[in-house]
């Protein structure tokens, strides 16, 4: 599945990734208010006959993922949480991957320290939660290519 997801991620242009992040930063300020604009990353595939992709995330790390009380701006229901929805950069990327795979998407909220265990146990299929590969994590799970690249740095006086 890693190679397939990498192929899907490779179809997302840098400009679209940047536009999506800018959009999510803006939307995270008032997530329950419908901005009335299309999400920057969209799939044209509406076929969900290949099953369900179960994704884990914290739903608490804006602009990557957050919890809201409406389905505004492309948010998806959080499985097992009545009237709560997830949105953010990670959610929109997960929606795109699921659509391109021909699958429905289910989002599950986990504490950060429980994400890898959720994949290992089979409770979910994957994590989209801004998690970077480390040697320890790579012993436990497989990683796709990066779906977000940051140029954040520390600024120091010369």
PLM feature spans:
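Hydrophobic/proline-rich hinge and linker segments of small-molecule sensing/allosteric domains
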Residues: 1, 55-65, 143-158
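Extracytoplasmic small-molecule ligand-binding "clamshell" domains
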Residues: 19, 23, 39-41, 46-131, ...
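Ligand-binding "clamshell"
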Residues: 1, 35-37, 123, 135-150
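Extended ligand-binding regions for polar small-molecule ligands
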Residues: 1-31, 91-100, 156-158
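Short, low-complexity, polar/charged sequence segments that are solvent-exposed and flexible
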Residues: 10-14, 72-78, 108, 145-149
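A residue-level marker of the well-folded mature domains of exported/periplasmic proteins
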Residues: 23-31, 36, 41, 134, ...
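Mature, folded catalytic cores of secreted/periplasmic enzymes
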Residues: 5-6, 119, 151-154
């Amino acid at each position: 599945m890693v190679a397939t997801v990498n192929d899907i991620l490779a179809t997302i242009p840098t400009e679209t990734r940047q536009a999506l992040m800018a959009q999510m930063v803006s939307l995270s300020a008032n997530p329950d208010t419908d901005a009335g604009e299309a999400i920057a990353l969209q799939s044209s595939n509406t076929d969900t006959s290949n099953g369900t992709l179960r994704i884990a995330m914290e739903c608490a790390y804006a602009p990557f993922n957050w919890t809201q009380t409406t389905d505004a701006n492309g948010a998806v229901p959080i499985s097992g949480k009545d009237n709560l929805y997830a949105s953010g950069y990670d959610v929109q990327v997960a929606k795109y991957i699921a659509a391109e795979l021909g699958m429905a998407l289910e989002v599950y909220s986990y504490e950060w320290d429980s994400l890898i265990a959720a994949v290992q146990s089979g409770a979910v299929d994957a994590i989209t939660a801004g998690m970077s590969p480390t040697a320890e994590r790579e012993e436990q799970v497989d990683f796709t290519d990066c779906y977000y690249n940051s140029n954040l740095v520390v600024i120091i006086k010369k």
